Regions:
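Binding-site signature for planar aromatic cofactors or substrates
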Residues: 1-181
């Protein structure tokens, strides 16, 4: 059933590229484990052991706080189609805000999206596939655009103000690095 791989191969990359969403879970030694769903065609495979996603401003910034505390994370893709499969990527995150070296290195790989807050790079240590037989069969209706429409309507100044209020510390009080030079 479950198989481990040291890196992504062409078949796994094709599977990732076909998925409309993914989940990222992260944690530090103490505090809550965070789990977030992500979409918006913002995930990119950059190499067999490297991927990244464009992170949009949201109500929290847990992954950034956890990246500062060691970066342990798992990214999961699962197929909701007739071809079941679950793919987990185990590794560590690094986060780069606009203007950072990480941002400059990878930003051109992403479409510009309103509210883009940071790029989360993920160094893959191992991959695991599982059957996915317990995952429900569902049909994608459409990608939600509410979040990017919200930030486009608010504009950059209001978005930056929101980040300063809501994204500087995690729900456990850990610094996220947002706003640091």
């Amino acid at each position: 059933m479950a198989k481990f791989f040291e890196a992504l191969d062409d078949k796994l990359i094709a599977f990732i590229e076909a998925q409309p969403m993914f989940f990222i879970a992260s944690a530090v030694g103490e505090g809550r484990v965070n789990l977030s769903p992500k979409g918006l065609d913002a995930f990119r495979v950059l190499g067999p052991n490297l991927c990244a996603y464009l992170d949009i401003t949201g109500s929290g910034n847990e992954t950034a706080a956890h990246a500062r505390g060691g970066g342990r994370a798992t990214i999961m893709f699962c197929s909701f189609t007739r071809n079941p499969l679950v793919l987990r990527l185990y590794g560590r995150t690094r986060v780069g805000a606009p203007g950072s070296a990480l941002w400059r290195r990878y930003a051109e790989r992403f479409d510009a999206l309103p509210g883009a807050r940071q790029i989360v790079a993920f160094d893959i240590e191992s991959c695991q596939t599982a059957c996915g037989f317990g995952v429900p069969l569902m049909k994608l209706e459409r990608t939600r655009t509410t979040l990017t429409e919200l930030w486009a309507a608010k504009g950059e100044a209001a978005t930056a103000e929101y980040r300063d209020k809501k994204n500087r510390v995690s729900i456990d009080g850990l610094p996220t690095g947002w706003g640091e030079a």
